């Protein structure tokens, strides 16, 4: 099979894990794999892995003969020109290449990559859409709606990472998606259950893992809750793992609030190491798809305290395998954390229940399962 993966994300985050891992599985199985991605980082291990498997990787955010730094400047001055350039690059690349059996368009949200899928539709190529997030915070503009609806209707399949995301996308589009399905992301911790538990005699430790982007990830909500008197007085520390454009402002916010037991650890490549020292995950997100870090924390036997957004409630049973905040607000988060604190003697038990539960909801090798589905989809498209 000849399979093409297209990603319009200009950075590397959780939404890049599924397509890249699946592409590696297909390439290892002898399929022809081509990747079109904006902002290819040659130092990224997944990119190096795909190149080692003889996959063709093309950067949509490059202009022939123009230095990368100059093109980056042009893009920063005009995002519209950047999107237009990516469309042209993809259009030419697909038109001049051997006709693919399937194109997989991966987008970080549920409509931010629609213009890339539109290229496939215009070229009459069989394609599938993968959406990694849908949120009430982001609705397509009316002028986009006609094209977005067209690319979803024409897709061979529309994949989402949670049932919530599928349902919300149908609401935003105004029609059902009969060829929609939920897929799982690959995770970066061991499938084998952990039996260790960090020392909890002097204090409890929570990790808040993710991109430092309060609009979506809600770290500001957590800082305000931790600034409340009772949390200041408790033997609880919180470490923020991850980087982002708002790291400095969040650090300043924590300093201004006088939060002495809050630490910013930056990006950590060894995810499993996080859970060697932390007792639980606190995720105050305002929007999500299916947080990879939530799956990883549960696989690691750590207690999750999360807001009821995205697919969180699809894997966390409140009070049994974790704690759900009813909404992404300070009071709701405080209430969920308070319930968790009152049952802190049960955290290891809750973590064990979470570990058992999540293994019934996700496959051991999500990328292999997705690769199989894509081959079946490509085969059916080829037969038409």
Model-identified regions with their sequence ranges:
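Aromatic "clamp/platform" in nucleotide-sugar-dependent glycosyltransferases that forms part
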Residues: 108, 267, 286
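Acidic donor-binding loop of glycosyltransferase active sites
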Residues: 102, 276-289, 302
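A short, histidine- and acid-enriched strand-loop-helix "catalytic/donor-clamping" loop
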Residues: 108-111, 127-142, 157
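Nucleotide-activated donor-binding/catalytic signature segment of Leloir-type glycosyltransferases, i.e.
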Residues: 251-268
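Conserved acidic donor-binding segment of nucleotide-sugar-dependent glycosyltransferases
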Residues: 318-319, 323-330, 339-344
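Conserved donor-binding/catalytic core segment of Leloir-type glycosyltransferases
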Residues: 4, 198-217, 223-226
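Short hydrophobic beta-strand element within catalytic cores of glycosyltransferases
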Residues: 303-306, 316
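A short, active-site helix/loop in glycosyltransferases that binds the activated sugar's phosphate group
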Residues: 154-180, 189
């Amino acid at each position: 099979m000849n399979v093409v993966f297209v990603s319009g994300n200009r950075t590397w985050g959780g939404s890049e894990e599924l397509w890249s891992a699946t592409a590696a599985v297909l390439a290892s199985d002898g399929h022809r794999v081509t990747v079109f991605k904006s902002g290819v980082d040659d130092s990224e291990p997944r990119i190096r892995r795909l190149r080692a498997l003889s996959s063709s990787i093309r950067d949509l955010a490059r202009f022939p003969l123009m230095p990368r730094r100059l093109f980056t400047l042009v893009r920063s001055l005009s995002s519209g020109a950047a999107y237009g350039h990516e469309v042209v690059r993809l259009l030419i690349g697909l038109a001049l290449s051997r006709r693919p059996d399937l194109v997989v368009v991966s987008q970080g949200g549920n409509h931010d990559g629609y213009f890339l899928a539109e290229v496939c539709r215009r070229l009459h190529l069989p394609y599938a859409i993968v959406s990694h997030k849908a949120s009430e915070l982001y609705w397509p503009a009316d002028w986009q709606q006609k094209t977005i609806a067209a690319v979803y209707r024409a897709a061979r399949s529309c994949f989402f990472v949670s049932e919530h995301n599928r349902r919300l996308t149908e609401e935003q589009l105004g029609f059902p998606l009969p060829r929609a399905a939920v897929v799982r992301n690959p995770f970066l911790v061991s499938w084998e259950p952990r039996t260790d538990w960090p020392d909890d005699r002097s204090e409890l430790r929570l990790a808040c893992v993710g991109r430092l982007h309060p609009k979506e990830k809600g770290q500001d909500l957590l800082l305000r809750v931790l600034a409340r008197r009772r949390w200041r007085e408790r033997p609880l520390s919180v470490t923020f793992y991850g980087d982002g454009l708002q790291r400095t402002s969040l650090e300043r916010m924590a300093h201004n609030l006088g939060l002495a037991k809050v630490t910013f650890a930056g990006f950590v490549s060894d995810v499993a190491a996080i859970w060697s020292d932390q007792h639980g995950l606190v995720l105050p997100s305002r929007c999500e798809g299916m947080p990879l870090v939530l799956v990883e924390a549960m696989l690691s036997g750590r207690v999750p305290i999360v807001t009821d957004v995205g697919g969180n409630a699809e894997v966390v049973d409140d009070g049994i395998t974790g704690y759900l905040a009813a909404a992404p607000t300070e009071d709701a988060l405080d209430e969920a954390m308070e319930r968790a604190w009152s049952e802190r003697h049960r955290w290891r038990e809750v973590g064990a229940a979470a570990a058992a539960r999540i293994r019934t909801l996700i496959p051991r090798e999500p990328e292999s399962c997705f690769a199989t589905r894509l081959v079946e989809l490509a085969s059916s498209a080829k037969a038409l």
